[in-house]
Design a protein with these regions (language model features):
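Surface-exposed, polar helix/loop patches in the mature regions of secreted/periplasmic/lumenal proteins
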Residues: 59-104
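Transmembrane beta-strands of outer-membrane beta-barrel pores
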Residues: 3-9, 18-20, 37-43, 75-81, ...
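Short loop/turn motifs that connect adjacent beta-strands in outer-membrane beta-barrel proteins
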Residues: 21-31, 46, 63-69, 109-112
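Transmembrane beta-strands of outer-membrane beta-barrel proteins
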Residues: 1, 28-37, 52-54, 69-75, ...
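Transmembrane beta-barrel domains of outer membrane proteins
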Residues: 17-19, 23, 57-61, 96, ...
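Outer-membrane beta-barrel "beta-signal"
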Residues: 14, 133-145
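Outer-membrane beta-barrel translocator/channel fold
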Residues: 25, 37-51, 73-89
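Solvent-exposed loop/turn segments connecting transmembrane beta-strands
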Residues: 3-13, 42-49, 65, 126-132
């Protein structure tokens, strides 16, 4: 579950993630990956849109950050419908890319809880103009099953 704010909108998101079977220990920390799927509702000043996305993400836990801290980043594909349109911005495509970077922390007896602060950018990658993009600052809570 995550909530976010942008210049022209607010978002509420639900989703699921699945850890990859791959992980690697490097000199400067541990890297793992996961698939993230999400459904969001964006509320803007002129209309509401639904966002569906799938994102592969990499997570880095630096050596010395033993208390569950991590840094994460990913780039995925999204469908936003109807096309995002506010008084200030108008997307020209329904298909968009979404990339994010986050810092977060796992906690709980079994590390089953997690929070993160994320910056996420959506745009069509210059497939068509206009391509103003939208940036969200998001707070995310995850409960691992």
């Amino acid at each position: 579950m995550q909530g976010g704010v942008a210049e022209d909108a607010q978002s509420l998101t639900v989703g699921m993630s699945r850890d990859w079977q791959w992980e690697k220990q490097y000199r400067y920390g541990h890297i793992s990956g996961q698939w993230q799927g999400e459904v969001a509702r964006w509320h803007s000043d002129s209309q509401n849109s639904t966002q569906l996305g799938v994102t592969p993400a990499l997570r880095w836990r630096p050596n010395g950050w033993d208390n569950g801290w991590f840094v994460e980043g990913g780039i995925g594909v999204n469908v936003i419908f109807p096309k995002y349109d506010t008084r200030k911005k108008e997307f020209s495509t329904t298909f968009n890319f979404g990339d994010h970077i986050a810092i977060g922390k796992r906690f709980g007896a079994d590390q089953q809880h997690e929070w993160s602060l994320r910056f996420q950018h959506f745009s069509n990658g210059r497939i068509r103009n206009p391509n103003p993009g939208e940036n969200f600052l998001q707070f995310r809570y995850t409960h691992r099953l």
